[in-house]
Amino acid sequence: MYVAGVMSGTSLDGIDVALVHIDGSGVDSKVELIHFTTVPFCNDMKNDIQQALSIENSNVQLICSLNFKLGLRFANAVKEVCKEANFPLRQLDLIGSHGQTIYHQPQQDGGMIPSTLQIGEPAIIAYETNTTVISNFRTMDMAAGGQGAPLVPYSEIILYRHQTKNRLLQNIGGIGNVTVIPSQLSEKSVIAFDTGPGNMVMDEVCQRLFQLSYDQNGNIAKQGVVVEEVLTYCMNHPFLKMNPPKSTGREQFGEAFVTGLLNRFKKHSKENILATVTMFTACSIVHHYKAFILPYYEIDEVILGGGGSYNNTLVEMLRNGLREEKCSICIQEDIGHSSAAKEAIAFAILANETYHRNPSNVPSATGAKNSVILGNITFPPYADENEANI
């Protein structure tokens, strides 16, 4: 099957789209990346999303409209990846769309029960592309008692398992998440959870203090010095004390967290603050390895992915934090994969599994009671593709 995976993450960089060919289904399926592209958000769209994410500034009218706007943007992004690959859109079998997370609440908070909301109307995508769309992947896992995250471990089992090596897959997107893929693989042996902020805090600090969307290659952070009192404040965040399975997001490490941090530590230089929150991401990752993984597994290889894997300062901090461990650290490209495309590929794989009526959550990662089939299916509007005017 030819499948397009569409991902818009917490970093708000844009829309990632991976066009892949998948042979078969289940953990033995074969996946080939044909083409990958990122379609950046225009400033107006990014501002609308940021407003929708803010409890103080959001409103239901905005979210309702944005749901349809994003659906159209996602559809256009699918058309773009097909155009760039010189691949006929009519030959596309399936689209897996994660959507844009507006709010994710994995645990009950007072009268608010566990819930999640991703938008980007699948009917718009299906209509514009005349292709079946699988969307809303997280809700069935939560219905089964899970946290709805992380969902990428199933795809990581397919793509990264190794006969002799115990591997850690560390994604550093807006949020960091890790998956343990043991060489002696069984579903229950796969551990996965969020490790805390990935790029989210760094990017927010960079935007506020330097008017830049991100710290390219970690060049600014490299000029600063880590401030211990600020790092201690960050490392005392309650999320780091929770046991897996667990997930987090902008609700805990977004604008409110950064506002509190900057107000509390105004006396320190901009460069030092950025260096410290970069170290916070590194230390939160290392903390979770030492607390929840390394006591149980001897790790041979740590494979970094996501935008944070291109931050040389962050990667060096991680290397220093894991220097005593006997494991190599590399990025996706070192083993023939793409850091940027990883999550979009994951949702193409999950869509393929849903199409074949296969469960694709990993209960040991999400905390769900059992394995379930993920996602909602939206069929194309035309029974005969020749009726479509596309």
Swiss-Prot record:
Q: What is its EC number?
A: 2.7.1.170
Query: What SUPFAM superfamilies does UniProt report for this protein, alphabetically?
Result: Actin-like ATPase domain
Which keywords describe this protein according to UniProt? Answer: ATP-binding, Carbohydrate metabolism, Kinase, Nucleotide-binding, Transferase
GO molecular function terms here?
A: ATP binding; kinase activity; phosphotransferase activity, alcohol group as acceptor
Q: In which pathway does it act?
A: Amino-sugar metabolism; 1,6-anhydro-N-acetylmuramate degradation; Cell wall biogenesis; peptidoglycan recycling
Kindly list the biological process annotations in GO that this record carries: 1,6-anhydro-N-acetyl-beta-muramic acid catabolic process; amino sugar metabolic process; peptidoglycan turnover
> What is the main EC category here?
transferase
**Reaction catalysed by this chain?**
1,6-anhydro-N-acetyl-beta-muramate + ATP + H2O = N-acetyl-D-muramate 6-phosphate + ADP + H(+)
For ATP, which residues are the binding ones? 9-16
Q: Which family does it belong to?
A: Belongs to the anhydro-N-acetylmuramic acid kinase family.
Say what the protein does.
Catalyzes the specific phosphorylation of 1,6-anhydro-N-acetylmuramic acid (anhMurNAc) with the simultaneous cleavage of the 1,6-anhydro ring, generating MurNAc-6-P. Is required for the utilization of anhMurNAc either imported from the medium or derived from its own cell wall murein, and thus plays a role in cell wall recycling.
Q: Which NCBIfam families match?
A: PRK09585.2-1, PRK09585.3-2
What is the protein's name according to its record?
A: Anhydro-N-acetylmuramic acid kinase
Gene field: anmK
